[in-house]
Amino acid sequence: MSQYVPAEGFVSNAEFLGKLISSAPKFETVSNGKKEIFYNIPAGFDIETSSFYYHGEKTAIMYEWTFGINNIITYGRTWEHFKTLLAAVTAVLQTHQNRRLVVYVHNLPYEFQCIRKHFSWTKIFFLDNRKPVYAITDKGIEFRCSLKLSGKSLAATAKDLTKYKAEKMAGDLDYSLIRHPETPLTEKELGYCFHDVKVILNYIQEKIEQDGNIARIPLTNTGYVRRYCKNACFPDEEVYTNASTYAEYEIDAIGVSRDERVLSRWLHARECPPSREIMYEGWLIRLYKFLSIRFGSKKVSDITRKVSWFS
C-alpha cells in the first residue's frame, strides 16, 4: 500500500478523474471473508444545504457537494454533476455489488434524505427509523456513517487525529443565508467544505491503519466493544469461526444440552430448577447476532471456579 499523503486543495472534476485513473491500478483491495471486496482507501462525501419553508412546509436545497477519494478532493454544485462524476468513478474502479468503494458521510441519516431519490439502492441497514448506518447503491458504492463510527462531531473527530492532522476550520458557514447552486461561494466558504471532507479522509485513513484494513472497521464505535468481548471470551479464532465446532464449544463451556442451546437462540431463557443448592450466574455469550447475558444453573463451587473468567 502506497504512503498516504493528505490532500492540500480542491481539484477540478476533470483533474479528479485523471488522477483517479492514474492511481486506480495502485489501489489495494481487501476481502471481508464473505466474497465481498473493498477498496482499501478512504473516501468521503459531504453536502451543504439551505433550509427554508415553502408553502408552509420545511424544505432544503443542496447547493454544494464535496467528494474525496484517497487524497483527491473535488466539488460541484448540482446533483446532476455529482451523479455524472460518481458514474465515472464506478466505471474507473469497476465497482459492483461484490467489489465496493466505501464512502463515509458524517451524519449519513441527514445526507441520505437528500441522496436517496438520486440513486438505486440494493441494501440499506437502519438502526432506527430514517437512521441508516450504511446504504449500498446498485453500482457498488457503499455510503457509511462516520458519525456512528467516531461517536463525535466532526470538529471533535478532527481534534482526535494523531497521525494525519486536519483541523476543522474555526466557525462555520452562515446557515441563515439562503443559497442555491448558482449562488457564488467565497474561497473561505469553499475552504469549510474542503476541510470537512479532508477530516473524514484523514480519520478513515487512520482507522484503516489502526484496524488493519477497511474491511475490519466496524459500522459503529460500539463494534469495538463487541470485538473486545468476543476476543476476550473466545480467544481461539478457529473455534469461533467454525460454526459446528463453535456450537460444541458453547455447549461444553456453558453446560447446556443441544436442545437447550437451540431454544436459547430464540427464547434467551432457561428453566430454573427449584433447589436451594443452586444459585444463578450470568456470563457474556454470542447468540445469533448480538452479545447476550445468559443465566444458567451452577453450583456454588462451579461459580467460584469460574470467577477468574471475568477478570
Task: Name every feature range the model reports, one short phrase each.
Residues 1-311:
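Metal-dependent nucleotidyl/phosphoryl-transfer cores and adjacent nucleic-acid-binding surfaces
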